[in-house]
Amino acid sequence: MKKIIRLLGLTMVLMLVFTMVLPLNLYAASTVTVDWGTNYQTIDGFGVSEAFHQSNNIALLGDTKKKEIYDLLFSTTKGAGFSIFRSILGDGGTWGNATDGPNKTMQPSETTWDWKESNDDQISMIREIQSGYGINKILYTVWSPPAWMKSNGSTSRGYLKTDKYQAYATYLAEHIKNYKSKFGIDITHIGISNEPNLETDYSSCTWTAAQFKTFMKDYLVPTFDKEGITAKVIMGEPMSCTESFAIDCLNDATALTRTDIVGCHNYGSSYTTFPTTKAKGKGIWQTEISDMNGNDTTITDGLKWSKQIFDFMTITQGNAWNYWWGACYKTYNGEGLIQMDMNSKTYKVAKRLYTVGQYSRFIRPGWQRFAATSNPVSNVYVTAYKDPATGKFAIVAMNDGYTNQSITYTLKGFTPDSVTPYTTSSTQDLAEGTKITVSGGSFTANLAANSITTFVGGSDVNPGIYGDVNGDKVVDAIDFALYKQYLIKQISTFPSPDGMKLADVNGDNSVDAIDFALIKKYLLGSITKLPV
């Protein structure tokens, strides 16, 4: 009896220990459904800036390190693959220095233009990244108009004088035209303000929504129309994630014609919806974000930024996400993805470069977000993106929890043969993993704790017509008869090469009586659309 009691006691202890250990390592797979047919916003890209002389600081590290930094920022095989470059339109301010300060202005007075390439140290970098990496989205943002246009005669603080609205509209148009004709730089996007709700000792200029509307409606629109300017105008770019500074322009018929994109930053705020922007069919760009506190270079900080991208894509449903500096001289905070030591001429890479790169390297301009179960289990966040033209796709899955998660991805409406994972964790940086076979329309993969993985693959962009199992481009009685033959095992496959895939009309990864019944209803007219 005592032996039995001892055995029972030991069994209970082992069960308790096993129960305590189990959650750390063994989980039933959670399911993510990825639906090719449910589409959301088009992605314009991801980007960084090297404003305030950071482009020159990169060059000062020497050609070898400059190329290494360029690769880390813009290469789609060695780095983050950024596709947007944000620059400052020089204002000639007197604050700062050669390491961190404004560029010279091309218009030092109302009657004087000074088109010298040396006035803008970003030009040489733009040429290099365009020729070396194909970067063709060039955004120039104005932190401040030249001092002679301002209410206080300074590039710091103050506002644009109303009697200089036309001068400012002309100033913007002339920069776009002359950068193309004199420097070979196509400014594709122009931001008319940076953080209009903030007065600073560095370059700044305050605006209200009403002032924006007056300037756009009465000055910028007619000037850009007259000069044939095609650059897209980014409106707003306030400190927080809000469309409020663009509302007046969005609701004015004339101003709306040149309000192409509503810009925002996200300092000290949460991502929100932009209902008016969406209703008017305009784009949404976050043009800047960073951490001005301590420089956390770990995976914890890195995952913070990948979660920000997830929120921006799913809540705001934005089109472009930009970090602040790509590489910068500040080693003590998080303003840059790469920190350069200008004394030792060395640099260090923060983990956030790679976690952001899990999106920016693989999701290319023109891709489209499509449906995926966004939060299948606590601390796991998933989004999916595709190139509608080629069938390439990327599924980004992040786990910022402390336990591994097994996730099954059920693919609806597309059938790749395999996916390739790329992972960033505390020990990996965009590391390519072993190819995973897709079987029966799904695959299962472990998502390690505190990591982010992008699953990359390709699918047939012309999958055929569901229900058309004989390949004659129509669903009819012939297909119905073939279904019947398949179910009673007279045939083991269908005449069309994609017949087995196209026969699964309810998307449950099997061909059975349910599909047969759905085809019957479709042919009888009881339903007008198949589930897939």
Regions found by a protein language model. Name each.
Residues 435-461:
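C-terminal beta-strand-rich structural cap/linker in extracellular carbohydrate-active enzymes
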Residues 375-417, 450:
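Carbohydrate-binding surface patches
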Residues 281-361, 368-378:
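Aromatic/acidic polysaccharide-binding cleft in carbohydrate-active enzymes
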Residues 4-25:
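Sec-dependent N-terminal signal peptides of Gram-positive bacterial secreted proteins and lipoproteins
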